[in-house]
Amino acid sequence: MLQRDVFVDQLKGYACLLVLLGHVLLGLISCGLSLPAFLPFSERFIMSFHIDLFMFLAGYVYHLTGDAASKGSRLRFIGNKLLNLGLPYFFFSAVYIAINSLTPGVNTASSLSDILQLWRQPVAQYWFLFSLFWLFVFWALLSRFFNNITITAVLFTVFTVLKYLNIDLGFLDSSMHCVLAFGLGTCLRSLAVQKLPAAARIAAILLPILIVSALFLT
C-alpha cells in the first residue's frame, strides 16, 4: 500500500489558506476602501503562485500514484477523472448558476442557459476542476508516446508559441496556462526537501523571492 505523503497534505493546506487570504484581500481592495499600501502587493504576491502550487501538487501526486497506468488503462483513468472531477464540476457549477441567476444584485450575473455552456466555458472558481481534468487527459494520452519531461516541454512550448502568435486557445486556455506547474510536478520524484543539495534548497527559497520582487517592486 502506498504510504500517504504528509508533507504534500500540509502544502495543500497552506495553499488553501493562501487562496482564502488572497480572495479576502481581493474583496477588500475591490470595495474601494482606504487600505495600507502593502495589502495590494500582498494580494498580487499570493495570486502570482497559489494556483500554480495546487497544480504542481496535483502533478506530483499524479506521478506518485502511478501516472495514467494507475487505473489499469488510460481510458479507465480518464473515466475515473470524469467521475471524480467532471460530476462535481457540472453539479456545483449548475447550482451556482441557478442561484446566481435568481439572485438580484450579484457582482456577476448569470443566466440558466449558461448551464448548457459548461462543457466549454467554466464559471467562477469551478474553472479549476475543469482545467485539472483536461490536464489529466493531456498527460494520459501523451504518456503513451512520451515521458513526463517531454510532455511538459512540448505542451509548454506549444502554449508559449500560440500565445506569442495571439492564437485563441478556446476552452483549453485555462488548462494550458497551468501545464508548466502541473508538468513540473509530474517530473519530480520526491518532495523530501532534506534530500536536496544545500545549494538547491537555498535557490528554491531565493529565486521565487527575486522573481516576485522584480515583477512587483520595480
Language-model region placement:
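Small-polar-interrupted transmembrane alpha-helices in polytopic inner-membrane proteins
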Residues: 150-163, 205-212
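Functionally critical transmembrane alpha-helices in membrane proteins and complexes, commonly lining
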Residues: 6-66, 85-93
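Interfacial loop-to-helix transition and helix-capping segments at the boundaries
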Residues: 39-51, 116-130, 164-183, 215-218
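Specific transmembrane alpha-helix
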Residues: 51-64, 130-141, 165-197
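Alpha-helical transmembrane segments and terminal signal-anchor/GPI-anchor hydrophobic tails
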Residues: 197-218
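Membrane-interface helix-boundary motifs at transmembrane edges
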Residues: 2-5, 67-79, 140-150, 189-201
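C-terminal TM-helix exit segments that contain a strictly Trp-centered aromatic cap at the helix terminus
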Residues: 22, 92-104, 212-217
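Transmembrane alpha-helical segments and their boundary/interface "anchor" motifs
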Residues: 44-53, 65-100, 107-124, 131, ...
